Amino acid sequence: MMVFQSFILGNLVSLCMKIINSVVVVGLYYGFLTTFSIGPSYLFLLRARVMDEGEEGTEKKVSATTGFIAGQLMMFISIYYAPLHLALGRPHTITVLALPYLLFHFFWNNHKHFFDYGSTTRNEMRNLRIQCVFLNNLIFQLFNHFILPSSMLARLVNIYMFRCNNKMLFVTSSFVGWLIGHILFMKWVGLVLVWIQQNNSIRSNVLIRSNKYKFLVSELRNSMARIFSILLFITCVYYLGRIPSPIFTKKLKGTSERGGTKQDQEVSTEEAPFPSLFSEEREDLDKIDEMEQIRVNGKEKINKDDEFHVRTYYNSKTVSENRDGNKENSNLEFFKIKKKEDCFLGFAKPFVTLVFDYKRWNRPNRYIKNDKIEHTVRNEMSQYFFYTCQNDGKEQISFTYPANLSTFFEMMQKKIPPFTREKAPSDQVFTCWSLINEEKKENLQNEFFNRIETLDKEWSVENILEKTTRFCHNETKTEYLPKIYDPFLHGISRGRIKKLPPFQIITETYIKNNIGGSWINKIHGILLKINSRKFEQTLEKFNRKSLSIEEKLSCFSEPQEEQNNSEEEIKIFKFLFNVVITDNNEQTFIKNLIYFDEINKKVPRWSYKLISDLEEMEAEDEQSILAEPGIRSRKAKRIVVFTEKETHNETFKENQSSDEKEEISFIRFSQQPDFRREIIKGSMRSQRRKTVIWEFFQAKAHSPFFFDRIDKLFFFSFDSFSFDIWGLKKKILRNFMWKNKTIYKTKAEQSKIEEKKRLQIAETWDNVRFAQIIRSSVLVTQSILRKNIILPLLIIIKNSIRVLLFQIPEWSEDLKDLKREMHVKCTYNGVQLSEKEFPRKWLTDGIQIKIIFPFYLKPWHNSKFQSSQKAQRKKAKDTEKKNDFCFLTVWGRETELPFGSAKKKPSFFEPIYKELKKRIKKFKTKPFLVLRIFKEREKFFLKVAKEMKNWIIKNFLFLKGKIKNLSKRNIIPVFGPREIYEVNETKNDSIMSNQMIENLSVQKKSMEWTNSLLSENKLKNLIDRIKTIRNQTEEISKEKENLTNSCNKPRYDSKIIESSKKSWQTLKRKNTRLIRKSFFFIKFCIEQLSIAIFLGIINIPRITTQLFFESTKTILDKYIYKNEENGKKINKKKTTIYFISTIKNLLSKKKKISYDLCSLSQAYVFYKLSKMQVSNVSKLKAVLEYKICITSFFVKNKIKDFFQEQGIFDYELKDKTFVNSEVNQWKNWLRSHSQYNLPQIAWARLGTQKWKNKINQDSIVLNRSLTKEDSYEKKIFDNYKKQNFFEADSLLNPKHNVKKDYIYNLFCYKSINSTEKNLDMAIGIALDNYLVSCFLEKYNIRGRRKIGHRKYLDWRMLNFWFRKNVNSEPWVDTKSKKKYIKTQVQNYQRIEKITKTGVANEKNFFFDWMGMNEEIINNRVTNLEFFFFPEFLLFSSTYKMKPWVIPIKLLLFNFNEKKNINKKITPNKKGFIPSNAKKFLEFFNLNKEEKESAGQGERESDNEKKKNLESALSKQEKNIEENYAELKIKKHKTKKQHKSNTEVEIDSFMGRDSRFQMRWNSFFNKKIITTLKVYCFLVRLKNPNEIILSSIERGEINPDILLISKTLPFSQLLKKGMWVFEPVRLSLKNDGQLIIYRTIGISLVHKKKNKISKRYKKKSYIDKKNNCDFFVPENILSPKRRREFRILICFNLKKKNARDRNSRFDKNIPNLTTVLHKKKNLDKDKNNLIKLKSFLWPNFRLEDLACMNRYWFNTTNGNHFGMIRIHMYTRFQIH
């Protein structure tokens, strides 16, 4: 039953698979997919369904649907029908046909009177609406689809058509599938429209219901046709906009440009004799005409130089001669017929090429060119060629059959009848073929098993492995042929044989030595170029008549040309098929065989030769330019760097009019992006899609897909409107956390911004048309105006004013300075020429005018007032930094760099103001010398003033008390003493509890005086009487109320009356009280006013003295500061000195404040707070009112009462709820005081230590036990933290705190190659040089390289973060000897590493070395280098952890290095001018011949010591250089032979190293450019000695940089690291074995480098017995035999049983396992996968599948699939 069920399931599955793979289902699927290819035709279809109504509307719907379906049916038929496919599949055909119809339709809908739109009958012929609707839907369906392009579907259809048998069924089923999808789509659209009409909620929102918009809606409905036409026009223009117009392009010049060149004759003559008749490569009629026209007229166009190349074809005599003597040339007749047809169809040919040449109208798109090839390849030629061949014993069609072989086979069949024979039956051929293969297979199997058996016997592996078959000279001597000449080898190992030069004279000895002993094919001797007379002498045994020169190709004639003499035929054939001549004595025959042509395939190329714009610029003479440039190069300009004029005799000058100048020039490229891309002028090109340029100056075009990863917000980026999101975020966070910190841009960032602005300005001037002409003329006029008008006028005005002010004029000094100013003409980049010499084409290319020693107007020259020592030093420093040159701008201003910001001129009036200030100061110092004494005795004066003040106040209070006592003895009111006593009674407690407070002393004495006046008895009696009266009145009132309540009920009016009575009574009571107390109130106010007036009078001298002291203090501070050299500035905003305040004692720096704040008593703190001035207390009032509510639980009640009585805060607002005891009770109080207001750094120290734990986690290495030094340093670091972290005096040592804070943050965030100088962390303070050096010394970061016992550095130790890929390098300042860290981004707008912006919780990723780190988890953007080849990721990670693996650079070069230890001496520099300045002066005094070869001796600076670079080239690269040098020498023979020495030197240098990218160091870059610019200017001068010293003093010339020696020591420059040569990727001539070794060597361990130290012995085990691991047993065989063995096994795979196939193999299974799996533990699944993948390649023929891809162009061999073969095999274990 189970078997039956499985059988049913198997049948169902197979049935389903058959249905799915059937032609009908696949066709329905592809047809349904084409429904989603929505194009412009859907606009017409929807318009007809939506807008049209009525009877005519239904007709339009039907016609639109019919036309739509008919158009799609034509598209499907074109898949099967080839002519229709050629017509519709070529897009330009549809474009040419659709454009007129589109314009017609557009104007028809927009023009009112073009057709009559009135009501017409159905039978009228003028009503073309329905027909036009049908045509619209039919034609626009044939267009290329708009939303979803149909190229993908067309490719899928073509692939399925290639492997489908029933093609018509496939086409019909796909059309049916499309029809079903279209019906469903239209039904869905209809349902949506009905739903919109029925849904009231949607219709209510539409404006149609309102009467206000009915007119607009009707207008909209009437103009829908126009709207649809506009939409259609926009879509079609968008489609057509991607293709430029083919009409307005540059045409070729016809045959004159296509023919007549040397290479064209080579193409026409070296191909097969009849290529156009049999080859598919000559399909195009126009190309046939071109080739035939060249061949017919070939003899007329032969030049003297072309004779050698053309004689190959014409000496072989294609013209065959009959026995009658009539010459016949079938090709010639064919050419004549074609010529007549061309004359007949004179107009048809250009029209056809214009409309139907869909690939290129006029010229190709690219022009492939190098040193060997100077003609572009015809990209119309395809390498697909179908022909029948025998495969697996049967005839099959091959689509990669060689076309030349097929044509040759057809020629042999037609021309030689004896070669044709009857074909054998297919079965017989198959059986013979299978038997041969079986025999081969058996032999291979036997050999394979024998090798395995010998391997079991423990033979050496070298003897068992099969070696490649080589060709030997003799059987006895095992001497192999060289690899180049070995026929059994193929590929790169064969090498390249250098051709002999065409006109080289070859002697007989050379022939005997080289060719005398070699074997030569006779067929080559007959068919190739041979001297006919000497050849006939060697063939005397044959009949000369039968083998004459005219008839030597007669055997290839037509079948009707029969030969009479059969014996002669037999002799000829015997001679032809005796392949080898063994007689070496036939010297005449051998001599003529020197000119063998190399057998290769000639690629069809265009005949014309084009040059680029760059070649036109680089051309030396105008005569060398043959034609106008035809290739658009990148925008560039030619800059002349050096001009040399040869001196001649006077007699020679008379004869010759002008001397020619030899120039050395370079090409300057624009900073703009290059969109020309070496495209041929006039060729059709497609626009670059998916690239956007939103900046005016942008280095590279970026895709909008990566727009979210760019920091810019807008699509434009001007410097004034740019918006940096991340920069703004940093600023906000930094301001939020640190309000006191100022944000400023560093100098490096500012310089980058200015550099970018300069480049933008330079590019705008260079790009705007006629801008350079305007700018150059304005600059010249500005220099003339400045030198001749403006500056002399200023000199006249200045000296005339001096005369008016009775001062001596300075005419001579000013004119001398003006004469010193020089206006040097420079190129656009700033290269100096001379003062009078203008650069070539300066109007169009641009000019710069450099002003040397610019003139600045000064009020006087020799100052009469001598400056101090400090001022003189400052002046000397300014002169060192000052550059005595500038560049002139268009506005007449000065800049330091071309197109830079304007330079600030030294002010004319500033020295005048300074001189006036000095004189005023000198005048002030004389009368105020006494103030110095007051300054010294300031404390004494303050104490005396304070004591006087206290004495006056005490006396005043005493007098005031006496006066009050005398006044109180008079009339005393009744109620007055009683009130005073009550007040005294309430305040006695507070006075007794706070006797220490001095502010209450006045009140206390006054109260005591009043208490002595009254006696206690009187007061008691009065109080008793008042109480009895009050009690009586209350009793009477209660009785009255009871009587009224019992008699009458209360009314509403009565209540109002009672309330009003009560309010009136209280008012009356208060008035009486006021009247009673008014006397005392007035008296109290008078007393307070008198006291205030008296105190003010007393304070007048105090205020005046205080102001006097303050003014004198400021004056003395200024005076003392300016006279003392090392004095520090005193803060002008210092707080005022209060005599009463005692806070000054708390703020003394000598005392230490501990962290334990509990030691302070509350009474002491609040007492000191109460002693503060009112201004300070007022600031704290709001804080105290709020904070005491929180901390009221901890504050004593007496202190609260005191503050409440003083009026600082209201006691009733206190919250008496319990507060959490964990809250720091003093924290909020102490924040309000300056001395306790701790900075954020200190609070961070007192807080948690999360960030410190993060530091410790980051610094942990995976294997902690590797180093002892690391752990030792860690312990020191931890102990240091424990000792210094909670120091008591750390708050009072700000320098130490800041230093510690920098150290911790540097350890966290700062890396060696960080891109920012400002640390992006919590503090945000720039690093101090001292702190960095202290940090490096203290924590021994410098000593990391001194780890001796660790053999290899683990890169996971370095937990640094990188934001961009930058080139950073350490540099040393020779003056300060402090280490800095400097980073520079050298590539302009280069996006090296993509970082996702805007992600929440953004993390700093781990250091991604080479993009291969395995620990990156959250990184969204993966490394794209290993996206396609993930297998290499594991290789790279193991390589990083085990550096002894064979390095990857071995795949590129073979380094042959020689390490030499050179002792380098760096002499100390003394003096202002360097020690080698004398050599530099001597250098300029040399002759002209010595100037070119002079340089400097070997010397090295401190910076150069650290950058020593060893560079070496491999032997293979040197061979490549020699080959290219030979080619260049040949190429430049036609150019000028007489060159100057400088040109020869530069050509030789560039010829040797032109294949290398040359770059220099950044430090070397800035200095060398400045020195070179000055050097170019100095070379032109006659006497440069005067300017050399000044330029050396100013620092423009650094003599250490210039190399003063007779030869250019490039090796020393390389070692010093100034110059670095990076090799360009070139094709290396490596052996096949070397490539295999390098490929396998990546995953293997090198024995020499894997030296195991003692500490690693316990961790790993190495198997010494097993030398290698076999991937597959087949690896014993050679690769060629292995492939053959696999293919032979896989033949007849279905017929063989498993037992038969493995019968021989099963016997040896145990032995095989012992060989392979002894002491190995490989997984079984992995082994099965290995076996599967090893046999997958030959079984399923992946070459054929890969060729079906769209990348099949130009792939004739399987080299492109080599990487696929490599990646099919998995990586194995390394033991």
UniProtKB/Swiss-Prot annotation:
The chain crosses the membrane at residues 19-39, 68-88, 91-111, 133-153, 176-196, 227-247. Its main location: plastid. Residues 1491-1512 are annotated as: Disordered. One of its GO terms (biological process) is protein transport. It comes from the Eukaryota. GO terms for cellular component: chloroplast inner membrane. Keywords: Chloroplast, Membrane, Plastid, Plastid inner membrane, Protein transport, Transmembrane, Transmembrane helix, Transport. It is a multi-pass membrane protein. Disulfide bonds: none annotated. It is found in: Plastid, Chloroplast inner membrane. Pfam families: Ycf1. There is a partial copy of the N-terminus (positions 1-343) of ycf1 in the inverted repeat (BAF50598). Involved in protein precursor import into chloroplasts. May be part of an intermediate translocation complex acting as a protein-conducting channel at the inner envelope. Belongs to the TIC214 family. Part of the Tic complex. This is Protein TIC 214. It comes from Lobularia maritima (Sweet alyssum).
